[in-house]
């Protein structure tokens, strides 16, 4: 995305010269290639004059025209079309979550308010996940409570993990209790993410639960448990050291020894 | 005489049928691959991958580099690998009991220090002597172990790799900077993906600086140029085409990526196997996809990895014979898949294709040439038929190769100069006169050696990339 002087120069070049009508005429053409190129530059230069044509192009049967128009409208920060983009994206098999995320992240943070209102009634896990990722991207604090409700009840791993990352990014301390339950999730990725989050959101009341996770079946979880304990509990390093070198045959202790030896090299 | 005539005619008819069948399969693969490429290019065109990885819940990846006597290139290679673009990756170098100064070079250049270690998994491998970590590059670990071969070294690497995704590369592979971003995407998009392969390209003639391709070129050697066309054909059409059926049966060992859980479930690589890269994929189909047919082994057409092709007949022969032995080994080990409806497309189409055309192809082709000459010499076929048949066969080969070059030009355009394109077109034409027959002969010999008990790897000499 262009910013500063580069943006000013390009914007002036396109919007204040004959380039703009030229690009708009290409946008109206029937050639997907010409439309895509025109949409790209008009979007970069935030040419408001192209808004209505771009909106019509969202209904195009051609996926590349849809994507380039959606991207241009996002750069124009045309928030009214957010849900039209979601709806139309479903028509195309290969419009992935990634493509939608890239487009949505081009809007300004104003998009969060609209997405928050929608999230209250949204049932689609993909849109929930994209929405929460965008909240994290924009560090949008007001969505904390709603996302907390979703995180607790969602059966979708992606949604839960995105929620945990969001809580960590905005340091949403109210989420700590929800994490208490998720620390025993049957999904290892969730357990690992919870432990990472606890390093920011947790307190000493979590100590025993984190120690328990040192005996987890998954390495990532064990690793995160050790590192979180060291961050969260003051003076835990000594206790961890005793555990590591006092139980030479214990597998959890072996992993702790490894983490300690890695840390000593890194420091 | 009449009976002999019938036999010869019958065999010729069989060869003709075989030829028509393989042509039809290639045509279908070409069409399917063409549409897949268009779709893939549209998907990737609007993606700023670095932005995607900043936003999304990506998975960490451990890149395993087995190294045996790599003292000449290991430092440069690792420095290049450490520059890969990925937000969270670990580089695991496995020194597989090198007898040269590979480990010493790592000590000298990467400030590695011994760390306490415990394997997280229990895949079979030779004894690990020590594990080292770099104080300069915190994401670099070095495993020093007793020699056990490539598959064994990879297993040792997996046992100590921290990440849920595992990439395996050859120590002398040259990777594109954003290759990890590209190869991990299928895992992020679909949690049923358990393995991903990418396109391997020939680096001979390209300008490589500090382990990075700075200018793509073509070698002056026609042997290398033929291989460029061969690789384009194999990757752009072959693997792309089979991918649509979820029928990838081989992912190149030069660069492959797996879900660690899948590798652990099938007990890792099979030590001592000749074609370990094919065997592991066939085993994944056999063991994992039978339990869960939704699992996917897929392929991305992006050129992500560059490798050095042999430029001498001796080394090329050794390579092709080894590849053929690997194919035969993998197919015979998993013959249970052959025409087995329990394995879906793999059992009923892809595996039989590999058995019939990739494994037995050289035998049928060599006998075909032999019988054709006999038939012609004894007047069982007319001159006009012989010329028509040979012309069709050769023209068909030319068309396939030229189509690969055109598809490359339409999609990735890695050879932008007109002179390069013309050279590739010429190679696509010329490879059908001698080169193809020669490689068929080597594959035939590879098969012969396999069945007569000579199943060793053979020597693979590489010149190395000069810069």
Predicted ranges, named:
Chain A
Residues 22-53, 62-68:
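Structured extramembrane domains adjacent to transmembrane segments
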Residues 229, 242, 246-250:
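N-terminal cationic amphipathic segment used for targeting or macromolecule association
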Residues 4-14, 36-45, 67-78, 87, ...:
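Structural detector for internal amphipathic alpha-helices that build alpha-solenoid repeat scaffolds
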Residues 7, 11-27, 47-58, 79-89, ...:
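Amphipathic alpha-helical scaffolding segments comprising HEAT/armadillo-like alpha-solenoid repeats
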Residues 30-31, 61-65, 92-96, 123-124, ...:
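Short inter-helical turns and helix N-cap capping residues of alpha-solenoid HEAT/ARM repeat scaffolds
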Residues 213, 221-222:
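Extended hydrophobic secondary-structure segments
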């Amino acid at each position: 995305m262009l910013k500063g002087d580069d943006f000013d120069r390009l914007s002036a070049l396109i919007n204040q010269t004959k380039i703009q009508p030229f690009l708009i005429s290409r946008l109206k053409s029937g050639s997907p290639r010409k439309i895509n190129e025109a949409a790209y530059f008009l979007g970069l230069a935030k040419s408001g004059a192209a808004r209505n044509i771009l909106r019509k192009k969202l209904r195009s049967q051609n996926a590349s025209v849809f994507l380039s128009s959606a991207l241009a409208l996002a750069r124009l920060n045309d928030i009214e079309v957010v849900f039209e983009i979601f709806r139309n994206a479903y028509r195309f098999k290969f419009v992935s979550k990634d493509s939608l995320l890239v487009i949505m992240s081009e809007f300004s943070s104003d998009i969060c308010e609209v997405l928050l209102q929608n999230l209250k009634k949204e049932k689609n896990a993909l849109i929930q996940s994209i929405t929460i990722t965008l909240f994290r991207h924009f560090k949008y604090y007001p969505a904390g409570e709603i996302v907390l409700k979703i995180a607790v009840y969602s059966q979708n791993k992606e949604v839960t993990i995105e929620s945990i990352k969001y809580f960590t990014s905005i340091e949403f301390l109210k989420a700590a209790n929800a994490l208490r339950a998720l620390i025993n999730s049957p999904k290892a990725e969730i357990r690992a993410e919870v432990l990472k989050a606890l390093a920011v959101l947790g307190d000493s009341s979590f100590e025993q639960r984190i120690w328990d996770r040192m005996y987890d079946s998954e390495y990532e979880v064990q690793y995160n448990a050790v590192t979180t304990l060291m961050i969260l509990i003051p003076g835990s390093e000594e206790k961890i050291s005793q555990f590591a070198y006092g139980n030479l045959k214990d597998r959890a202790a072996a992993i702790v020894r490894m983490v300690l030896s890695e840390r000593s090299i890194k420091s | 005489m009449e009976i002999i005539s019938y036999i010869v005619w019958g065999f010729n008819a069989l060869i003709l049928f075989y030829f028509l069948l393989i042509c039809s399969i290639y045509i279908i693969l070409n069409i399917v691959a063409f549409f897949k490429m268009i779709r893939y290019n549209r998907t990737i065109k609007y993606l700023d991958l670095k932005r995607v990885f900043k936003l999304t819940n990506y998975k960490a990846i451990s890149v395993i580099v087995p190294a045996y006597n790599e003292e000449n290139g290991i430092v440069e290679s690792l420095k290049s690998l450490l520059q890969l673009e990925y937000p969270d990756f670990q580089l695991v170098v496995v020194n597989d009991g090198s007898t040269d100064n590979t480990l010493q070079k790592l000590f000298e250049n990467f400030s590695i220090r011994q760390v306490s270690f415990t394997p997280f998994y229990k895949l079979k491998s030779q004894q690990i002597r020590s594990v080292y970590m770099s104080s300069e590059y915190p994401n670099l670990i070095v495993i020093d172990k007793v020699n056990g071969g490539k598959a064994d070294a990879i297993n040792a690497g997996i046992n100590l790799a921290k990440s849920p995704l595992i990439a395996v590369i050859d120590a002398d592979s040259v990777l594109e900077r954003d290759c990890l971003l590209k190869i991990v995407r299928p895992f992020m998009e679909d949690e049923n993906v358990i393995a991903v392969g990418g396109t391997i390209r020939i680096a001979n003639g390209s300008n490589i600086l500090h382990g990075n391709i700075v200018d793509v070129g073509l070698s002056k050697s026609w042997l290398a140029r033929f291989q460029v066309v061969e690789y384009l054909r194999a990757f752009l059409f072959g693997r792309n085409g089979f991918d649509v059926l979820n029928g990838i049966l081989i992912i190149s060992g030069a660069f492959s990526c797996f879900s660690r859980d899948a590798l652990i479930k099938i007990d890792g690589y099979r030590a001592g196997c000749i074609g370990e890269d094919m065997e592991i994929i066939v085993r994944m189909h056999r063991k994992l996809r039978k339990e869960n047919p939704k699992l996917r082994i897929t392929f991305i057409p992006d050129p992500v990895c560059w490798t050095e092709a042999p430029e001498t007949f001796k080394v090329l022969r050794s390579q092709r014979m080894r590849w053929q032995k690997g194919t035969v080994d993998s197919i015979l080990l998993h013959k249970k898949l052959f025409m087995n409806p329990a394995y879906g497309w793999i059992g009923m189409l892809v595996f039989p294709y590999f058995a019939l055309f990739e494994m037995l192809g050289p035998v049928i082709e060599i006998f075909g040439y032999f019988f054709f000459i006999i038939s012609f010499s004894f007047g069982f076929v007319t001159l006009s038929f012989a010329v028509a048949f040979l012309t069709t066969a050769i023209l068909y080969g030319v068309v396939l190769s030229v189509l690969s070059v055109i598809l490359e030009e339409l999609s990735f355009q890695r050879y932008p100069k007109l002179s390069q394109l013309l050279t590739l077109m010429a190679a696509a034409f010329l490879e059908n006169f001698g080169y193809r027959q020669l490689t068929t002969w080597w594959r035939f010999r590879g098969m012969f050696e396999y069945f007569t008990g000579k199943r060793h790897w053979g020597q693979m000499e590489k010149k190395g990339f000069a810069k």
